[in-house]
Swiss-Prot record:
It comes from the Bacteria. It comes from Haemophilus influenzae (strain ATCC 51907 / DSM 11121 / KW20 / Rd). Pfam families: Mu-like_gpT. To phage Mu protein T. This is Mu-like prophage FluMu major head subunit.
Length: 308
C-alpha cells in the first residue's frame, strides 16, 4: 500500500498533466474552417465593430448599419468545466493507471468543445437570432428595395424541398472566403487544467478524492446571414444548384451586388457518402443518363461535421 504524501500526489498529477496535453493535441479540429475566432477580454463582447467593416454598407445598408453601431450585437461568454475524480484509495492501492486514459479523454473533449459549439450553432441557427433580429436561418430577412432600406422585402437563406427533412438533418452552403466567416467563435479562456490536490481541502477531506479538471470560457454567435444557406432537403444535384443560385442571388439594400460565392458545403455524418459521390465523381446521373459532374470543378470543400 502506497503512503499518500503530497510529493506522491504532485508526481501523479504531473503525469496526469501529460495525459491531458496528449488528449488535447489529439482532438480533431474543424471549427476554424467556418468560424472566425475572436479573442475576448470581458464577460461579453458587443460587436458594434461589425458596423465598421470596409464596404459593409453595401452588404446590409445604412438602416441596419446604424442599428448595429448603436445597439450592437452581443455574445456572452459561458463557462465550461469538467473533471475526473481520483479516489484516494486507488492511490493507496497503486491503482492509478486506470485514470490516465480518462484524463487523456478529458483533454480530447476539451479540445473538441469549440467544434461542438461552432457546428451546433449551425443547427441552432434556425431558432437563434443574428444581427438583424431574425433567426440566422430564416425566410424573412429584411432587405430594402431602396438604398436607404425602405420598401423592404423578405429574403430567405433556407431552401426547403418539402420532403420532410428536419432541421437536425439539414446541410449547409457557406461562403468562408471573407475575413469574417459565417460563425463567430468567441474565446475568453482557452481550456485550462485545474487541480485539487491539497489533502486539507474540504472536498478531499469529505469525499476522499482528488480532482483533475479543466475549465474554459467561450461562446458562439453569428456573422452575416448572407454568407450561409441552409437546405432542409435531400442532397441532390438539383437542390445543390438551387442553394448555390439562391446564395449568388442575394443582394443588399438598393439591389447592390454582394458577390456571394459558396466555398464550403457542410453535411452531417449521415450524408457523408452522398456528398462525396455528388462532389467527387467524374460522372453523375441526370434523367437516367450519365453526364459530366460539374460540381467536381467547382472546388466546393466538403466538411462532414462531427457535431452536426
Amino acid at each position: 500500500m502506497a503512503n499518500v504524501t503530497p510529493d506522491l500526489v504532485k508526481a501523479l498529477f504531473v503525469g496526469f498533466g501529460k495525459n491531458f496535453k496528449d488528449g488535447l493535441a489529439k482532438a480533431p479540429s474543424q471549427y476554424t474552417e467556418i468560424a472566425t475566432v475572436v479573442k475576448s477580454t470581458t464577460a461579453s463582447n458587443t460587436y458594434a465593430w461589425l458596423g465598421q467593416m470596409p464596404g459593409l454598407t453595401e452588404w446590409i445598408g445604412d438602416r441596419t448599419l446604424t442599428a448595429i453601431q448603436s445597439h450592437g450585437y452581443s455574445i456572452v461568454n459561458k463557462k465550461w468545466a469538467n473533471g475526473v475524480e481520483i479516489q484516494r484509495t486507488d492511490i493507496e492501492d497503486d491503482n492509478v493507471g486506470v485514470y490516465s486514459p480518462l484524463i487523456e479523454e478529458l483533454g480530447r473533449a476539451a479540445g473538441e468543445k469549440a467544434d461542438e459549439l461552432v457546428f451546433g450553432a449551425l443547427t441552432a441557427g434556425f431558432k437563434t437570432a443574428c444581427y438583424d433580429g431574425q433567426y440566422f436561418f430564416d425566410t424573412d430577412h429584411p432587405v430594402g428595395a431602396n438604398v436607404d432600406g425602405t420598401n423592404q422585402k423578405s429574403v430567405s437563406n433556407i431552401t426547403d424541398d418539402s420532403t420532410g427533412v428536419t432541421e437536425a438533418n439539414a446541410w449547409y452552403l457557406l461562403d468562408c472566403s471573407r475575413s469574417l466567416k459565417p460563425i463567430i467563435y468567441q474565446e475568453r479562456k482557452a481550456p485550462t487544467p485545474a487541480q485539487i490536490t491539497d489533502a486539507n481541502d474540504e472536498k478531499v477531506f469529505m469525499k476522499d478524492v482528488f480532482t483533475y479538471g479543466v475549465d474554459s470560457r467561450s461562446n458562439v454567435g453569428y456573422g452575416f446571414w448572407q454568407m450561409a444557406h441552409a437546405v432542409k432537403g435531400k442532397l441532390t444535384a438539383e437542390n445543390l444548384w438551387k442553394a448555390i443560385e439562391a446564395m449568388r442571388a442575394v443582394r443588399g439594400d438598393g439591389d447592390k451586388r454582394l458577390a456571394i460565392r459558396p466555398t464550403h458545403i457542410v453535411v452531417p455524418p449521415s450524408l457523408a457518402q452522398a456528398a462525396t459521390k455528388l462532389l467527387e465523381r467524374e460522372l453523375r446521373a441526370e434523367d437516367g443518363v450519365a453526364v459530366d459532374n460539374e460540381f467536381k470543378r467547382m472546388n466546393l470543400k466538403l466538411i462532414v461535421g462531427d457535431y452536426l
